[in-house]
């Protein structure tokens, strides 16, 4: 009995120390929410809403003058490569060496969560519970969900509720393809993911399902393109008891799995995260729990071999809706021979010629 009590005490203190370590790590780490690259600078916003700036060549931080009254919540490049930032109070600004210039102020102070631009350079915003066009002052919410990891209900006759399939789910990833289709997706741990499509040129919701894409087994980590074709690529991965991941190539609303981690032995499977393609060399870069891999992008068929490029040592946190960790790398960018990676807890990393540097160390 005494040994059992002692074992319980040891387990308690181990758990306590682990929780304390995670809390301390979270409290001392500056979290970068998003970033864009426009030569000669790297622009980033923190989770707490402040703006940061680094030089792409020297990787040194540069002081920037901006209105400290604003809480920045989104950042993007428009089609003319202007840096645009959104705020918690529903304001859009152009950002340049001359500071902030007000571009648009929403009629209501909705928090701007994501910003994208179509080929006509028209902005589309994700605000709470809607996709919104500030140009036409129009919003869209009626996206059809044949499958959803979330149960959404609508109240009727004051007291009754019924489950509905037409609604808007806030996405974690937003991407505009070469045909001006806005791809919005997110996932909810082991329960799978969602996909919402919108034609930004015709300004209408697309309810066409993507064939061969099972949303219950869909865990989107990034959306990207090869820079040459109309194909859309989505990296999907989760760590739930075991690591797993896939990369889909989608054309004409049909998904083809070009990387299937089930082809690997169980103990060698990879938790696939953010990915990107260097269009010049047609090289695919893939973030995993073991490091960043590279492989030639196949013209057709599946990826057969991947090579470990680098293995950054990163902090991680637990995935709340699965038995495992969150992906530590949120975004990958290949720019002028350097691989930039936006991390969840370690700021922005840069890999170049075998060396890793960090722009923001905890």
Where are these regions (language model features)?
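Structural motif
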Residues: 48-53, 91-94, 131-137, 190-196, ...
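Repeated scaffold domains used in trafficking and secretory/extracellular systems
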Residues: 28-37, 69-78, 109-120, 148-156, ...
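Surface loop/turn motifs at the tips and blade-to-blade linkers of beta-strand repeat domains
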Residues: 26-27, 63-68, 104-108, 145-146, ...
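Short coil/turn segments that connect the beta-strands within blades of beta-propeller domains
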Residues: 39-40, 80-82, 120-121, 179-180, ...
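Bacterial Sec-dependent N-terminal signal peptides
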Residues: 1-31
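Blade-level signature of beta-propeller repeat domains, shared across WD40, Kelch, NHL, RCC1
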Residues: 330-362
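Loop/turn-rich, solvent-exposed surfaces of beta-rich toroidal or solenoidal domains
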Residues: 266-298
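Recurrent small/Gly-Pro-centered beta-turn motifs in extracellular repeat architectures
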Residues: 45-46, 87, 127-128, 184-187, ...
């Amino acid at each position: 009995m005494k040994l059992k009590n002692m074992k319980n005490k040891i387990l308690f203190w181990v758990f306590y120390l682990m929780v304390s370590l995670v809390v301390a790590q979270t409290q001392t780490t500056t979290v970068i929410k998003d970033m864009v690259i426009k030569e000669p600078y790297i622009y980033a916003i923190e989770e707490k809403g402040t703006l940061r700036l680094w030089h792409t060549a020297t990787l040194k931080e540069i002081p920037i003058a901006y209105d400290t009254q604003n809480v920045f919540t989104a950042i993007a490049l428009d089609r003319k490569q202007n840096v645009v930032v959104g705020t918690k109070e529903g304001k859009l600004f152009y950002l340049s060496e001359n500071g902030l210039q007000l571009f648009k102020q929403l009629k209501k102070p909705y928090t701007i969560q994501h910003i994208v631009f179509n080929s006509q350079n028209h902005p589309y915003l994700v605000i709470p519970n809607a996709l919104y066009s500030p140009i036409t002052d129009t919003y869209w919410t009626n996206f059809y969900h044949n499958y959803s990891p979330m149960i959404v209900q609508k109240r009727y006759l004051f007291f009754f509720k019924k489950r509905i399939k037409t609604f808007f789910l806030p996405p974690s990833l937003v991407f505009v393809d070469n045909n001006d289709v806005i791809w919005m997706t997110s996932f909810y741990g082991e329960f799978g993911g969602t996909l919402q499509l919108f034609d930004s040129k015709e300004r209408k919701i697309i309810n066409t399902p993507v064939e061969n894409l099972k949303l219950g087994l869909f865990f989107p980590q990034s959306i990207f393109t090869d820079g040459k074709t109309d194909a859309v690529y989505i990296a999907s991965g989760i760590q739930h008891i075991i690591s797993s991941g896939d990369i889909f190539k989608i054309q004409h609303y049909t998904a083809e799995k070009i990387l299937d981690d089930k082809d690997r032995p169980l103990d060698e499977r990879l938790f696939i995260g953010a990915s990107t393609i260097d269009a010049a060399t047609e090289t695919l870069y893939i973030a995993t729990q073991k490091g960043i891999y590279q492989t030639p992008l196949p013209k057709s068929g599946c990826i057969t071999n991947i090579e470990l490029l680098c293995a950054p040592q990163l902090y991680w946190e637990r995935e709340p809706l699965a038995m495992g960790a969150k992906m530590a790398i949120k975004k990958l960018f290949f720019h002028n021979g350097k691989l930039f990676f936006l991390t969840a807890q370690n700021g922005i990393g840069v890999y170049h010629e075998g060396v890793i540097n960090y722009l923001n160390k905890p």
